[in-house]
Amino acid sequence: MNRELGLWGEELAAQYLRKKGYKILERNFHTRYGELDLVCEKDDNIVFVEVKTRRSTRFGSPEEAVTPRKIGNLKKAAILYLKSTPRFFPEISFDVVSILVEDGKSKINHIINAF
């Protein structure tokens, strides 16, 4: 995947989530375990959102790129984020926003509490 497509997908996902009532707290939060694409707040809870954007399903759907190893790293990165903020969140969840771009159209699939 090229970086430009990924950044475009993250922006589209952020716009989509804002319309759904999410507040974007951080974008591209870097840790030694990898990057948290979007860190959001919804109903006083924190939501870590992994965004996957693809131009085709030839190698699987975008959400299939969220492997067990990736999930483990996202959870470790989330712990580091939580340690870095003084805020308390009663609930923590992980969502996936997959974006498939085909024939000039984008299809968004938002998986709430994906793992």
UniProtKB/Swiss-Prot annotation:
One of its GO terms (molecular function) is nucleic acid binding. It holds the Pfam family UPF0102. InterPro entries: Restrct_endonuc-II-like (IPR011335), tRNA_endonuc-like_dom_sf (IPR011856), UPF0102_YraN-like (IPR003509). SUPFAM superfamilies: Restriction endonuclease-like. CDD domains: PoNe_Nuclease. Coiled coil: none annotated. Belongs to the UPF0102 family. This is UPF0102 protein Swol_1475.
